[in-house]
């Protein structure tokens, strides 16, 4: 696959699934974090009530988890809480296919970070290392540059290995035999479901079956079971 080709999927009302989502930019999210660190103020203007900001930072539930380098001992109003590099931190991450977002800040240190990247396989790990380096620099952490060099080199090595593994997986999927009981032309058409809507199957010039379901599209491949296909 050509990784330079943009992913066709974009967030729309039809694909704003799971817990939902939002569209924003790095500058706007940075302004949002400035408000978090300034009791709702951005510059001299009170953008959000200070009482709301303080309440949103208060832990509402206890948790006992971790995401990469980030401890999660509680959950506030949309913010995970925990200690990071010896300081209290609030953070929330998110993502979509081909994209990963990172928002975090240290209220006591007055430091915040926004990282948006469009890498698919290692996006979360990449932003994790950027955060390690950025906070390390901001806090004057000894040896952070050498540590970052080592971690980024390991990530680059892992990326090459994952790329090769992805190629092997795609080749294995393409090699699966088709076990359809009818000619492929028989499966082309429109399929309607009361809850799932319409799925369109089209026989293409290369004899492959293209599947479209609303905003989603893919090319089917063979599957192990009779009269089944794989659609990803």
For each feature predicted by the language model, list its residue ranges.
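Extended acidic/charged loop-beta regions that coordinate divalent cations
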Residues: 1
């Amino acid at each position: 696959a050509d990784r330079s080709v943009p992913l066709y999927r974009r967030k729309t009302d039809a694909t704003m699934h799971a817990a939902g989502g939002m569209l924003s930019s790095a500058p706007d999210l940075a302004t949002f974090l400035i408000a978090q660190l300034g009791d709702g103020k951005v510059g001299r203007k009170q953008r959000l009530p200070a009482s709301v900001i303080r309440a949103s930072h208060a832990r509402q539930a206890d948790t006992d988890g971790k995401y990469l380098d980030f401890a999660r001992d509680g959950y506030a109003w949309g913010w995970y809480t925990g200690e990071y590099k010896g300081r209290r931190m609030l953070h929330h991450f998110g993502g979509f296919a081909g994209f990963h977002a990172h928002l975090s800040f240290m209220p006591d240190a007055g430091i915040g970070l926004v990282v948006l990247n469009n890498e698919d396989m290692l996006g979360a790990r990449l932003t994790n290392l950027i955060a390690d380096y950025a906070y390390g620099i901001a806090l004057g952490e000894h040896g952070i540059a050498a540590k970052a060099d080592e971690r980024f080199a390991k990530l680059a090595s892992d990326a090459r290995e994952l790329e090769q593994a992805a190629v092997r997986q795609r080749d294995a999927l393409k090699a699966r035999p088709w076990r359809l009981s009818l000619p492929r032309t028989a499966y082309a058409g429109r399929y309607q479901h009361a809850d799932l809507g319409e799925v369109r199957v089209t026989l293409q010039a290369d004899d492959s079956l293209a599947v479209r379901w609303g905003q989603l599209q893919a090319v089917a491949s063979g599957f192990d079971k009779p009269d089944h296909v794989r659609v990803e």
